């Protein structure tokens, strides 16, 4: 059985295919855009172009994520926590703490013996999410990668507000005072990482695994490891953890 996982997030829509041998055979990521339904259709078209027919007799599809109910061709809908846990087990192992920083929320999942033992989620405030970094990078007139590169050479400038709106006002004030851009970039990233580390530190502890879009930001990984006092492991496929977990579960459907 071929399993296809569709993970419609708030900012990125991802698909993953697990083949009959249980290997991750294909992945794809696209911006979610305005419509989750349109995003799921674009992923279906990408799958078809890659040779995967979602209506095939030997294919099963599981949808997850923020827009999981907007995938009309899914055979089953499964929660984000379950799919991220399953995906993390496939990528990293069956024990540890998974930290997933998404566009609009941050999830911390404790794995024990290959199962989700407990989890915590911050979906009420964007200040500890990828969206916060996106907003601040826009305010600084640079990309998120440029912000990370600048932050390496910056001195820490404290961004104290717990609210994205007020934090943006702080950044505007710092810009107005002539604070070097690299210092502001360092302060912004440290602000996000400290919030994430606080959540993760309340879980079971090491080993730590980072998934989600920020796993591709090496500076974020370094700063998170420094604050946790423990290595943080990631993977080239870590941003697809939810989709991979959904695909694994799809492959197990009868």
Feature roles, as predicted:
Residues 1-21, 95-112:
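Gly/Thr-rich phosphate-binding beta-strand-loop-beta motif of the actin/hexokinase/Hsp70
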Residues 3-45, 117-119, 123-124:
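Short glycine-rich, Thr/Ser-proximal phosphate-binding strand/loop in the N-terminal lobe
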Residues 20, 28-32, 50-82, 110, ...:
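Short beta-strand-loop/turn "lid" adjacent to the catalytic site in phosphate-handling enzymes
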Residues 35-36, 113-159, 163:
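Glycine-rich phosphate-binding loop plus the immediately following alpha-helix
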Residues 54-66, 202-214, 232-235:
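Short glycine-rich phosphate-binding loop at a beta-alpha junction
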Residues 133, 235-254:
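Glycine-rich phosphate-binding/hydrolytic loop that grips phosphoryl groups
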Residues 167-201, 239:
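Adenine-nucleotide phosphate-binding core of ATP-dependent small-molecule kinases
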Residues 200-227, 238-242:
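Glycine-rich phosphate-binding loops at beta-strand->alpha-helix junctions
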């Amino acid at each position: 059985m071929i399993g296809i996982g569709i993970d419609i997030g708030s900012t990125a829509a991802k698909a993953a295919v697990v083949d009959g041998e249980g290997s991750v055979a294909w992945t794809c990521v696209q911006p979610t855009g305005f419509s989750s339904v349109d995003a799921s259709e674009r992923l279906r078209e990408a799958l078809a172009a890659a040779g995967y027919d979602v209506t095939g007799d030997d294919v099963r599809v599981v949808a997850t994520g923020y827009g999981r109910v907007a995938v009309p061709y899914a055979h089953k809908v499964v929660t984000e926590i379950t799919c991220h846990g399953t995906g993390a087990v496939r990528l990293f192992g069956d024990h540890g703490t998974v930290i997933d920083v998404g566009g609009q929320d941050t999830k911390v999942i404790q794995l024990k013996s290959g199962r989700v033992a407990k989890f915590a989620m911050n979906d009420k405030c964007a200040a500890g999410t990828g969206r916060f970094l996106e907003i601040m990078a826009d305010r600084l007139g640079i990309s998120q990668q440029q912000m990370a590169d600048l932050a390496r050479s910056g001195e820490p400038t404290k961004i104290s507000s717990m609210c994205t709106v007020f934090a943006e006002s702080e950044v505007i004030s710092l810009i107005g005072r002539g604070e070097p851009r690299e210092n502001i970039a360092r302060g912004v990233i440290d602000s996000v990482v400290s919030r994430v580390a606080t959540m993760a530190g309340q879980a079971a502890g090491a080993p730590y695994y980072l998934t989600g879009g920020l796993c591709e930001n090496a500076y974020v990984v370094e700063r998170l490891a420094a604050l946790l006092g423990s290595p943080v492991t990631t993977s080239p496929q870590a941003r697809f953890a939810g989709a991979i977990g959904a695909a694994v579960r799809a492959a197990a459907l009868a």
